[in-house]
UniProtKB/Swiss-Prot annotation:
This is Thymidine kinase. Substrate binds at F115, I159, E160, I161, I162, G163. The lineage of its organism: Viruses, Varidnaviria, Bamfordvirae, Nucleocytoviricota, Pokkesviricetes. The keyword Ubl conjugation does not apply. Zn(2+) binds at C140, C143, C172, C175. Its EC number is 2.7.1.21. Keywords: ATP-binding, DNA synthesis, Kinase, Metal-binding, Nucleotide-binding, Transferase, Zinc. The gene is TK. ATP binds at G13, P14, M15, F16, S17, G18, K19, S20. It holds the Pfam family TK. GO terms for biological process: DNA biosynthetic process; thymidine metabolic process. Belongs to the thymidine kinase family. It catalyses: thymidine + ATP = dTMP + ADP + H(+).
Length: 181
């Protein structure tokens, strides 16, 4: 373990809840404080090119990878590591735990549940190892109440379908169970 204290900060929530926006906000705050930051994004999310881009078009440069083990942990010189779409990385727990134990600050933005309201990937296993966990809500795109869930509105049945408003809605509990929107 490194003598400098690292930690893990997780930002969870449904689609359109501002997870990536909050991740970028925190990263920019660390940059103002003269911390060096590295941003990692899921390589199969090609909606906005190589960088991390929010639905509001705020952006930061990012390294696209399929798996976190593609990154040589010993070569990371950054103080802070931001990871977007953390639910897609099967090695998220081991990577974050190792890096935090070696003095790095990890900020992970991720969906907590699938469109079926099931745990998404390995991300919930990271919670017991995290110092900070924030669960955001969105606005229900049907009734405009508070939304905690992502509902797929396209016909695909695979868990990993990357998309935006053309494929998903943020919904509340009541609207999640409505058949026709």
């Amino acid at each position: 373990m490194n003598s400098r204290s690292g930690y893990i900060h997780i930002i969870l929530g449904p689609m359109f809840s501002g997870k990536s926006t909050e991740l970028i906000r925190l990263l920019k705050r660390y940059q103002v404080a003269m911390y060096t930051c590295l941003v990692i994004k899921y390589s199969k999310d090609e909606r906005y090119g190589r960088g991390l881009v929010t639905h509001d078009n705020d952006s930061v440069p990012a390294i696209p990878v399929n798996s976190l083990n593609e990154i040589n942990c010993n070569d990371i010189n950054a103080d802070v590591i931001g990871i977007d779409e953390g639910q897609f990385f099967p090695d998220i727990v081991e990577f974050c735990d190792y890096m935090a134990n070696n003095g790095k600050i990890l900020i992970v933005a991720a969906l907590d549940g699938t469109f079926l309201r099931q745990p998404f990937g390995n991300i919930l296993n990271l919670i017991p190892r995290a110092e900070y966990v924030l669960k955001l809500t969105a606005v229900c795109m049907i009734c405009f109440g508070s939304a905690s869930f992502s509902k797929r509105i396209s016909d695909e049945q695979e868990i990993e379908i990357i998309g935006g408003k053309e494929k998903y809605q943020s919904v509340c509990r009541v609207c999640y169970f409505k058949i026709n929107n």
